[in-house]
């Protein structure tokens, strides 16, 4: 976003804003992860590289949204607050297209729709409870950050995942 010559509007849930803007440390950027990324550098360069990297992840949030809010883009996009993967994680339902964008709340693995990845989800119990919200929508297509598009028995699969 920082290298784009276009204005990119950053929209997030209020619970996520302080992480995006850098007021709170990112939950997944633990020292051991940073060490894995920058461990090959000499000690005097490592801290500088880590600081520059963490600074590069920060962005100003232009607008905060709440659960159930409908954005005017694409014929209406409903915000679905789905904490668990992060405290302010959201999904988006494109009303006109019956398409659910789940971010990291769901994944597609080997063509199958599966739940959140426990390795990258700090609050698995909350993440699983959040899946129930997806069953309230008339979904024909699911788009996941990891794994891409899932179509087929979407409604049935969402109900199965919500039940655990």
Go through each PLM region and give its residues.
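Acidic/His-rich, metal-assisted hydrolase cores and their charged scaffolds
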Residues: 163-164
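Metallo-beta-lactamase
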Residues: 53-56, 60, 70, 76-83, ...
């Amino acid at each position: 976003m920082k290298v784009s010559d276009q204005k990119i509007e950053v929209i997030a849930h209020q619970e996520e804003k302080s992480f995006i803007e850098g007021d709170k440390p990112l939950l997944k950027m633990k020292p051991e992860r940073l060490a894995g990324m920058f461990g090959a550098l000499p000690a005097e360069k490592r801290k500088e590289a880590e600081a520059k990297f963490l600074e590069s992840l920060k962005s100003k949030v232009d607008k905060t949204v709440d659960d159930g809010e409908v954005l005017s883009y694409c014929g209406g996009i409903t915000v679905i607050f789905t904490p668990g993967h992060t405290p302010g994680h959201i999904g988006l339902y494109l009303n006109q297209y019956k398409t659910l964008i789940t971010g990291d709340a769901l994944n597609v693995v080997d063509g199958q729709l599966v739940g959140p990845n426990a390795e990258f989800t700090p609050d698995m119990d909350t993440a699983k409870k959040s899946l129930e919200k997806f069953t309230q929508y008339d979904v024909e297509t699911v788009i996941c950050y990891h794994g891409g598009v899932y179509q087929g028995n979407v409604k049935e699969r969402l109900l199965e995942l919500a039940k655990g």
